[in-house]
């Protein structure tokens, strides 16, 4: 039952009574009190065809699954969905994409959703790929009333130069391409102008709310949910628990209620981990299986990468070999690992009983955190990155060039992954960029070239390249310098397998390996 205010009272008395009235709420029946709605169906009832909607979450962590299902049930069509990821085929935004309810996706990574990629390449869906940090800032700025901003991310790539395929025709030709963006120089560095996003609706998922709309998120499920709360005409939060006013300490509130228009309590959440990774207890009675050749190769690269870590360093590691390198950080060395989805202080993979779907890394893998770790939203995460506060970033590549160009996010018309946070990471001032990769493609062709043939992730951004065969440094005006050669290879081998000219260091040495 709803409590009602009556009578003519002083302002102070009215305020006190208002708080008591709001605290006396019921979620039973069709009625709602202030911001509290009965259900997802009730909360999304006024969403019309053609709406632009921000969908919180990262992969399938922290997604507003009840509202997504309500939109499916309601049958809203022609949605422009703004989401960091396209979810997977049967979860997250993928639910609406599969039903052909989404006409356009604005996001940074789509590689895990095969149906999204199919619709995009076959001309059924428009996709505007946007660097993850730029997307977070477009949303943050939109919520702060800032119409546009400048960022170093994406300069001299398709993001800035235009020409990125947004929509294909049925016959596979590019029907709509991205437009060229303005550039301005500040202190000798080029910056790209990006317009902000302010949507019709923002659908977010939180752990707790009070009737005023104050929100608390759980661990890494804060991600894009936090900035999206601020950047829409109507923000709806689905939560696992609604607590009375005053139950949340002001210090623990992550998003103030001023940004939230509607809340409802969801039930029976289907929380999943997209990539379950666990640490298996070692059985000393069972010998470890012999490593396969691919594993030996990866570990050789990872053990060389680990020599670049130093005590007190902040590092961001891409998926695959970069993450593997963290296994070789020397005991006693303190390296804080940053993850774009909002974690500082990543730990090892959890044991089976410690898996938490609200605690994943940027590769959507289950993780733990170390003592002293912290959680934050995606906008804060990329402020750390873009601001140059991360000392080193280690990424994979499809191609690299002799001048330090990097290509690792798409093959036009064939492979669509998205750039994720890579463009932001490599554009950060003062951050050392190391590329780890196999020296050659599966067909034997070189991946180190004079000029990249694929769309760039960054121009002139690489500082070091580490493969299973060699280590190169990259310097402006100098190009590639071979500084180390792996055991079993010669300089002639490196020349034969590299598609770019390079200088051999006078101090050339055998490739280093951190002891194990």
From Swiss-Prot:
Subcellular location: Mitochondrion
SUPFAM superfamilies reported in the protein's UniProt record: NagB/RpiA/CoA transferase-like
Pathway(s) per entry: Ketone metabolism; succinyl-CoA degradation; acetoacetyl-CoA from succinyl-CoA: step 1/1
InterPro entries: 3-oxoacid_CoA-transf_A, 3-oxoacid_CoA-transf_B, 3-oxoacid_CoA-transferase, CoA_trans_fam_I, CoA_transf_AS, CoA_transf_BS, NagB/RpiA_transferase-like
Keywords: Mitochondrion, Transferase, Transit peptide
Task performed by this protein: Key enzyme for ketone body catabolism. Transfers the CoA moiety from succinate to acetoacetate. Formation of the enzyme-CoA intermediate proceeds via an unstable anhydride species formed between the carboxylate groups of the enzyme and substrate.
Name of the protein: Succinyl-CoA:3-ketoacid-coenzyme A transferase, mitochondrial
